[in-house]
């Protein structure tokens, strides 16, 4: 009954209106398991290849080549394979036999495309859970060898800037984390209340237009100073109890190693506001001193290992320094970051690396190093895989946008269902969001 009998892919659309790949895996028990691939706006240069068509259709962003690779190469090759054998399907068949492309950071998926491979990997994972007749999150936990399921703390991205919004704010995300909640359900209540209170604060201060939302449902008021964004959050969370702040700077979007940094979104920029990497480091330290910040993601360029290590050494005890573009969910880059003490948390994005198996390995390495893990991707579909992934791997944190826009709420609603299903066994990460479980 676990045998794969049919695989089909198609082109669908993500939350930005860009084409993406969806795959369906049918097993001998007649069940069809479907999965769609997410994408990102600010992508790291070390991510596995996302195969796009080029040309004029969809401004070059079509994925019909990747779809063809599933329908004509991957699909036929996996007929008869056991859907519960996730590692064998990912590594032995799709990577080694079918794609075979490698660079200094491992399997790069340049022949078939990480989006083609990942669509099948995700759908196979869902099929494996179906065959075993267990929830997807439990199947993922079993694949990882994780004995304890944990509901993550949601990091609500409530103010958008950078590549996620049309305002002048350089830093990309300002988030709230309800670590003081006793359950995921209560965390949602806190997040929603802060979100609506923030909307009222922004509307009163900047006008109705300022409550327009960005890519992830967060507000995008036309503010230019990053500190102003933090002040807005400080005001909004004052009445909400134990809620703390996280930031995604996405510094690779406006900064290069050995060059000065400037606000890339400032019109008629004359260079007068450029600062050095050391000055930027000190700016983060001042933010941490002044605001209840517990997480800073991508504080420097993806190649600036030196300043990542400096910042982690100086404030890593009280703040998690999250590697996104730095790590791209790649086990080999995680290994390097552990050795160099460049950060102390992994941003888990399955599409950066292109398979369930490699994602699990990156998480296990991170946990063994004592790191935190946060699951995420911004260019989303209605697929809720990431919700089950965060519970099954006990990441402790999930970042999937504001409590706004249906592709965002689909994940949060799935987490509410999982918590309800677990009943008295449900555990919410809360204040232990950085280390919710022992390494597995």
Swiss-Prot record:
Keywords: Cytoplasm, Glycolysis, Lyase, Magnesium, Metal-binding. Mg(2+) is required for catalysis and for stabilizing the dimer. Pathway: Carbohydrate degradation; glycolysis; pyruvate from D-glyceraldehyde 3-phosphate: step 4/5. GO terms for biological process: glycolytic process. The active site is at 216 (proton donor), 349 (proton acceptor). Its cofactor is Mg(2+). This is Enolase. It comes from Alnus glutinosa. The lineage of its organism: Eukaryota, Viridiplantae, Streptophyta, Embryophyta, Tracheophyta.
